[in-house]
Amino acid sequence: MPLNDDTIFEIAHHYRFQWEPAQQMHVLLYPEGMVQLPGSSGEILKRVNGTARVGEIVADLEHAFPGADLRGDVIEFLEQAHGKGWIRTKQG
């Protein structure tokens, strides 16, 4: 799937994204289990809300973590998350 700055993602319907106090990290819950999202993966995924464009997610993260060029890492994570079915492109 070609990903660009205007692509909008949302969490796939059978997943629920939340902070898990027991693990002290964000997780994706699904009927068969849980995916742990330590550090940057949780920071990226918490910005996937069905309205934010990829470019906005990158800009927000670079604002939150100044001095870091995060574009490549964010794009790579979003591509992997999409490939694993955790997120899907928002359908208008």
Where are the language model's segments positioned?
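Acidic, low-complexity/disordered tracts enriched in E/D and polar residues
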Residues: 1-46, 91
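Long, charge-rich, low-complexity alpha-helical segments
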Residues: 33-92
